[in-house]
Amino acid sequence: MSMFEDVTRALARQLNPRGDLTPLDSLIDFKRFHPFCLVLRKRKSTLFWGARYVRTDYTLLDVLEPGSSPSDPTLLGNFSFKNMLDVRVEGDVEVPTMMKVKGTVGLSQSSTLEVQMLSVAPTALENLHMERKLSADHPFLKEMREYKQNLYVVMEVVKAKQEVTLKRASNAISKFSLNLPSLGLQGSVNHKEAVTIPKGCVLAYRVRQLIIYGKDEWGIPYICTDNMPTFNPLCVLQRQGSTVQMISGEMHEDFKTLKKEVQQETQEVEKLSPVGRSSLLTSLSHLLGKKKELQDLEQMLEGALDKGHEVTLEALPKDVLLLKDAMDAILYFLGALTELSEEQLKILVKSLENKVLPVQLKLVESILEQNFLQDKEDVFPLRPDLLSSLGEEDQILTEALVGLSGLEVQRSGPQYTWNPDTCHNLCALYAGLSLLHLLSRDS
């Protein structure tokens, strides 16, 4: 992960813990995430480990009929952050035979980041909605309609108030130093990084979905379900004054919802033939620990789905094609796996070889089930049976796997320290383990 991503993710956590503020991934794209910019949501995004959006070259104003410009976004507040990337420094902790936990010392940030939060005012949106109709024949809208793409409008942004150069130096790759040569996680690297963030750079943002109905009517609902498409002439919208709102039931985000979501996606993968599942496992096994290649595969599948192309993976027989629902499900799990660190991905490869994925899945499921809505850091007991069946090496692998998500497991007790900031990463780990467990059951 780049330093810019570290900064934007840390900023989003500080301003809106476990909320819907999305950190910007790429510095070069910041001009395409200003208020009223149109963006695409990556396929199979989920709020459980963070939705991701892709830039377009258009704004909402570009696809409306000509008319008056909306008023400037409203300033919601100014904020200042210093040493945002500093982490807690821990002393060396010896764990039996094969693992040493080290604090990531030497990480520093020498500058103060000053930001401001800006939002499109409700009155500005209402006036725009009343005064300007949709340009129904706009080529961009025609293309998006043809490929059934959902469009989202940037409604709120966090911007840098001044140009700032952030620096850091680190003397370790990760928190864990495992004495397992096959994982390639030993050793440390001394490196320095710096990133210059220009004045006005968007660092994080909030979006709302654009809904298009009729020939030239549009709306930006306050509430919108995932299965509501942007282009839907049959959708029912209610007007309250000049505000368009979607009729929608209340959504509950808890562990049961995550579990149901993951089960639905695994069911689609399960529909593959045994040969297809085995070949998919082979392909993923070669890519785990190679995060860039996983991301490339994700982009390739997204592009194929957008254009309606058939897809085969390298390890799949030529007659085993991935149908759309299976590709959607694989994209969902790729999104989860790419949220994990390369160290975690390498540990998953070893865990797969050692056949300990079922235990690891139960452990993560138990922790999330107990603490999903817990918003304070605390120490909780761990069921002894969750780790007692593992040998020494497998227990260390499992502790490191969840530890790299930010969850500290202590054998004394046993117990673990829950940190709400780790929830998103643990959700991604839960989904990744669910897929690999399913695929490895036949092997």
From Swiss-Prot:
Swiss-Prot/TrEMBL domain comment: Intramolecular interactions between N- and C-terminal domains are important for autoinhibition in the absence of activation signal. The intrinsic pyroptosis-inducing activity is carried by the N-terminal domain.
GO cellular component: cytosol; perinuclear region of cytoplasm; plasma membrane
Family matches, as Pfam families: Gasdermin, Gasdermin_C
Family membership noted in the UniProt record: Belongs to the gasdermin family.
Gene field: Gsdma2
Record InterPro entries: Gasdermin, Gasdermin_pore, Gasdermin_PUB
Sorted UniProt keywords: Cell membrane, Coiled coil, Cytoplasm, Lipoprotein, Membrane, Necrosis, Palmitate, Transmembrane, Transmembrane beta strand
Triggers pyroptosis as annotated region, ranges: 1-249
GO process annotations (BP): programmed cell death
Effect of deleting the gene: Mice lacking Gsdma, Gsdma2 and Gsdma3 are highly susceptible to subcutaneous group A Streptococcus (GAS) infection in an animal model.
Transmembrane segments: 78-95, 99-120, 164-179, 183-197
Ranges in a coiled coil: 249-312
Expressing tissues: Expressed in the gastrointestinal tract, specifically from the middle to the upper region of the gastric mucosa in the glandular stomach.
Domain of life: Eukaryota
PTM remark: Cleavage relieves autoinhibition by releasing the N-terminal moiety (Gasdermin-A2, N-terminal) that initiates pyroptosis. In contrast to Gsdma, not cleaved by bacterial effector protein SpeB. Palmitoylated.
Binding residues for a cardiolipin: 9-13
Protein name: Gasdermin-A2
